[in-house]
Amino acid sequence: MLVKTFGSALTGIDATTICVEVNISVGINFFLVGLPDNAVKESLHRISAAFETNGFKMPGRKITVNLSPADLRKEGSAYDLPIALGILGASEQISAELLDKFVIMGELSLDGTVRPIKGALPIAIQARKEGFRGLILPAENAREAAVVDTLEVYGVNTLAEVIDFLNGEKNLSRTEVDTRQDFFDKSTRFDIDFNEVKGQSHVKRALEIAAAGGHNVMALRFLFTGSILIPLLHYS
């Protein structure tokens, strides 16, 4: 049986959606193709252990996993989760109905815990462009991805949570972010401000430029009133 899940590959700040094709047929052995690096190749061992600790079985037949497009290098351990779910779906151990509706990423630990990934925001942006219903990601990455509106973003902590959701046994809490409210909540107010320093416009301008560009400033000597106040304001 052939099942498709979807992940994503990062190239700099750009994401490319990856189709994870899993086919189970007569025979033995596990084949992972599609230009995977060593971390991706090691996924079999993490997935097998996660299955065992969560009451599932690695099919005793020939398993072929293709990461498409095959000419793009696949790096990292974040493909563990989509590969694992593809294997479970292809072996009919879970429902495969929702697998192609979401972009799914996450590293699996041996006990089935889902570990964080990198690049949740560009992955979410690309998923929205391609019309996916949403994303299933590690809980630590959910808020970052949820900044992209119109997507259903679900943060998960374990493999079992994802399986229960796909089987319709339990609902996941959708992560939503109000970016406007977050901005105001994180706005910082200070008791003092540059407008309380009279004159010294050239010094204030230099410090503003340094702060905007993230440059270091060395204050050698200030021979005027406010000599302590100005460096303090810049530090704030």
Name each region found by the language model.
Residues 1-220, 227-232:
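Peripheral, non-AAA+ core regions of ATP-driven protein-machinery
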